[in-house]
Amino acid sequence: MAVGKNKRLSRGKKGLKKKVVDPFTRKEWFDIKAPSTFENRNVGKTLVNKSTGLKNASDALKGRVVEVCLADLQGSEDHSFRKVKLRVDEVQGKNLLTNFHGMDFTTDKLRSMVRKWQTLIEANVTVKTSDDYVLRIFAIAFTRKQANQVKRHSYAQSSHIRAIRKVISEILTREVQNSTLAQLTSKLIPEVINKEIENATKDIFPLQNIHVRKVKLLKQPKFDVGALMALHGEGSGEEKGKKVSGFKDEVLETV
């Protein structure tokens, strides 16, 4: 019989239970605040590891991008097919101040608009806003039947598509260049630009389901705390000193 180590006796230490530590004890919660251009500013909560040593929690939070449904921000189910991206730019206590970072459509909404017997027209432009944000905006539109039309389809010719795409690009460029990022966001929510495109292209070919389907942020200017505070409705009031009345200097006779 070979003499050696008994493997069964050496298994005792492996069966010891390890101390279970709840990972959430090392984390803390922060409230996400949307800009004042939206009706509901309370987006939700996010967590991050607590500040320890040289690692600061605010450094891990800055630049974090969250995706929110526009229906939750506006309190209306009419905007349920839009997704808005918000970027954390500043940490104030337990509040995270965000800025607009982009917008997109849900996949089911896009697929529901694509149908037979019509032409899909897409256009995109890269423009800089008046406050130096570089955006790439994608627009989508579909043709519809003309009044008293007998034909089943409403296909547009290539010349019509080029003319419509040119008009859409011109309108998008003009609206973005003459607006700040906050003003542009307020125009995208009620779809003001869509109605302008529909009126401008009705002489070329009648359109329907015109939407700015996507907004992508390509470049942003240098971070300005004052502009972010104004966007969140904070720090807009000027702090002015008041004139003091009834004050007399006291002269001491002896020092």
Curated annotation (Swiss-Prot):
Modification type N-acetylalanine: residues: A2
CC annotations in GO: 90S preribosome; cytosol; cytosolic small ribosomal subunit
Record-linked InterPro entries: Ribosomal_eS1, Ribosomal_eS1_CS, Ribosomal_eS1_euk
Subcellular location: Cytoplasm
One annotated GO biological process: cytoplasmic translation
Positions of modified residues (Phosphothreonine): T254
Keyword Phosphoprotein: yes
Post-translational modification (record): N-terminally acetylated by acetyltransferase NatA.
Annotated protein name in UniProt: Small ribosomal subunit protein eS1B
Keywords from the UniProt entry: Acetylation, Cytoplasm, Isopeptide bond, Phosphoprotein, Ribonucleoprotein, Ribosomal protein, Ubl conjugation
Record organism: Saccharomyces cerevisiae (strain ATCC 204508 / S288c) (Baker's yeast)
Keyword Kinase listed: no
Modified residue annotations for Phosphoserine: S245
Membrane-crossing segments per the record: none
Covalent cross-link (Glycyl lysine isopeptide (Lys-Gly) (interchain with G-Cter in ubiquitin)), residues: K248
